[in-house]
Amino acid sequence: MSIFLNKDSKVIVQGITGGEGTKHTARMLAAGTQIVGGVNARKAGTTVSHVDANGAAVELPVFATVAEAMAATGADVSVAFVPPAFTKDASIEAIDAGIGLLVIITEGVPVKDSAELWAHAKATGNNTRIIGPNCPGIITPGEAL
């Protein structure tokens, strides 16, 4: 039984084209997580190639915004692998889009930025659950990573 993440969760990766995003997307796919795309405004309209848990090649679309990714894929979870300087804006974008769960992996996020993104989430009232910043991720054994 999962609390936040399960085999049916549709996950987008903010920062999918960066080094950490690329590495961890591969690991999540290998664990069976249903990654449905990524977000990078500068690389929107492209795809990234990976291999899923069954060894099959997958092409993941890259979108300009979280809202666009959610509309196209039905994503309900976002995991953020963005540099600390961009974490607040990326998080607020996901919150404003109404993502159900936001997992912020990034470490070194300024405390002020963390406080502001949490205050923004509370003010919107859209019930986005946030784990992080500076989080090692979440796992539901046998279902998703």
Segments predicted by a language model, with ranges:
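Generic hydrophobic/aromatic pocket-lining and core-packing "Φ" positions
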Residues: 25, 66, 91-95
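NAD(P)-binding Rossmann-fold cofactor-contacting core
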Residues: 29-55, 133
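General beta-strand structural signal in soluble alpha/beta enzymes
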Residues: 13, 37-40, 62, 104, ...
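Rossmann-fold NAD(P)-binding glycine/threonine-rich loop
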Residues: 107-131
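N-terminal Rossmann-fold NAD(P) dinucleotide-binding loop
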Residues: 21-22, 87
